[in-house]
């Protein structure tokens, strides 16, 4: 049996070279100084794989349209087995990946590992950091709650303010002052279709460059015998990865991530709050108002990125021990103090978070029933076109988050079955346009539909049976 197994492995290795390459990878020479400070790269790759895996699991139950995204998130959090855990792993995994990538770059900068011939490796790392931050930016909108909506409005407004490119960026983002279906679709496409393969290819290129030039040594390594990656460094990397997973799993289980209320474009009093890793930029914008806003939102971040890319070409001094890189330490301390100070100021000056949605985590909310066909169960295949169009508009606006139809939906507003027997068409139309006038104290926003939309949605509502 053992001889047969050896023949199989020999056949595979002869055809694919997989065993030879694995051995070459594990037994590669690394500097004698290698140790704990070089585990961050492996942890970052692990967290990327976690993000890909949990993202795929979430996508199985996520509806990528504004009308259904919010309800599908409710469904994931309430009905899908381990849905809240997967959501927590994905959310906190994004934050941890940013932390680990930043720590990895700090370690590389502190040790001077970006110096010749490793300039391209450093630049690939900078681009990976930007891609990691872009994940958080594009994924922020996808829950389609108030926090997601208004946070993205700020992003699109910043993009619109970029000199010369503003109008083109707004068009690219599908936003001309508001955030709608086009913006949602493009953020989703970037988050799911573009960023993962781009990140995977860049990680592969980064690893190839590291293997080509080797792990950067420190002064004195040439006087000591080199080590093999396996077993000691592989063991340290494994311990670091396991520790990261324990921290991530604990956060996903303990830290509750409630949805806020359904995105409300009319809630102009809402104060958007970005994720913690963007709070420093959020605070910096407060110091640059009016014509100077573009300086804080575009110019300073752009200069910082440009400077990061140029570091290997600016610092051409000989490699020295970390203890002698005083200027590098001062730069890290200064950057950390600036980031920490701005973040702390943002936390102190930001009002409490928005009101969480009233979600019964013990009760089922099947978003698959919140489709035009199911919402209009009284409207079968012979239903008039206006009723079908109205059902689609009802879904698009997320009305089922507050109103129950055929026993499915929210309970914030009155159930809509039998509406035609309780209200006239004129009353419903006026309620859409001036809800506070018709029902003082209501939380329902105004919906100034055009004539066709108004006719369609009222027609649909009046086809819903008792």
Task: Cite the ranges covered by each PLM segment.
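Extracytoplasmic electron-transfer domains, predominantly the class I c-type cytochrome c fold
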Residues: 384, 401, 406, 410-466
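Electrostatic cytochrome c docking/interface patches
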Residues: 367-395
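Signature aromatic-anchored transmembrane alpha helix within multi-pass, membrane-resident enzymes
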Residues: 331-335
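Membrane-embedded alpha-helical bundles that constitute the cytochrome b-like, heme-associated redox core
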Residues: 1-283, 287, 296-326, 336-349
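Glycine-rich, acidic and aromatic/proline-enriched surface loops and short helix-turn segments
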Residues: 55, 164, 396, 434-437
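Alpha-helical transmembrane signal-anchor/signal-peptide segments
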Residues: 350-366
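Terminal regions of secretory-pathway proteins
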Residues: 337-345, 361-374
């Amino acid at each position: 049996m053992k001889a047969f197994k050896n023949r199989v492995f020999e056949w595979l290795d002869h055809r694919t070279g997989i065993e030879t390459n694995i051995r070459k990878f594990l037994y590669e020479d690394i500097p004698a100084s290698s140790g704990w400070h070089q585990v961050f790269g492996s942890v970052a790759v692990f967290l990327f794989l976690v993000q890909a895996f949990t993202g795929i699991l979430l996508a199985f139950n996520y509806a990528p349209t504004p009308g259904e995204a919010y309800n599908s998130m409710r469904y994931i959090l309430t009905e899908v087995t381990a849905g809240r855990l997967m959501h927590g792993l994905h959310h906190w995994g994004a934050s941890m990946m940013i932390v680990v990538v930043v720590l990895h770059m700090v370690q590389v900068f502190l040790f001077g590992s970006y110096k010749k011939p490793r300039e391209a490796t450093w630049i690939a790392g900078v681009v990976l950091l930007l891609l990691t931050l872009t994940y958080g930016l594009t994924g922020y909108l996808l829950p389609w709650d108030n926090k997601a909506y208004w946070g993205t409005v700020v992003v699109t407004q910043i993009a619109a303010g970029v000199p010369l490119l503003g109008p083109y960026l707004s068009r690219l983002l599908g936003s001309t002052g508001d955030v709608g279906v086009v913006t949602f679709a493009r953020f989703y496409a970037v988050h799911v279709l573009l960023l993962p393969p781009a990140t995977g290819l860049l990680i592969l290129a980064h690893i190839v460059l590291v293997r080509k030039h080797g792990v950067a040594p420190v002064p004195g390594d040439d006087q000591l015998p080199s080590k093999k990656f396996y077993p000691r460094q592989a063991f340290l990397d494994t311990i670091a990865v396991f520790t990261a997973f324990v921290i991530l799993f604990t956060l996903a289980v303990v830290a509750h991530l409630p949805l806020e209320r359904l995105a409300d474009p009319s809630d102009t009093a809402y104060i958007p709050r970005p994720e913690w890793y963007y709070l420093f930029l959020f605070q910096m914008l407060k110091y640059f108002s009016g014509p100077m806003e573009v300086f804080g939102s575009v110019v300073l971040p752009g200069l910082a990125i440009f400077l990061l890319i140029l570091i290997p070409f600016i610092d051409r001094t000989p490699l020295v021990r970390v203890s002698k890189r005083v200027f590098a330490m001062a730069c890290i301390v200064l950057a950390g103090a600036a980031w920490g100070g701005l973040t702390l100021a943002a936390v102190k000056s930001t009002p409490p978070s928005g009101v969480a949605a009233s979600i019964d985590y013990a009760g089922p909310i099947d978003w698959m029933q919140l489709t035009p066909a199911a919402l209009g169960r009284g409207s079968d295949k012979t239903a008039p076109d206006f009723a079908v169009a109205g059902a689609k508009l009802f879904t698009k606006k997320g009305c089922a988050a507050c109103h129950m139809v055929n026993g499915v939906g929210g309970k914030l507003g009155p159930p809509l079955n039998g509406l035609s027997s309780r209200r006239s068409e004129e009353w419903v139309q006026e309620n859409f346009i001036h809800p506070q006038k018709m029902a003082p104290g209501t939380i329902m926003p105004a919906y100034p539909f055009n004539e066709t939309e108004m006719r369609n949605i009222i027609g649909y509502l009046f086809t819903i049976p008792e």
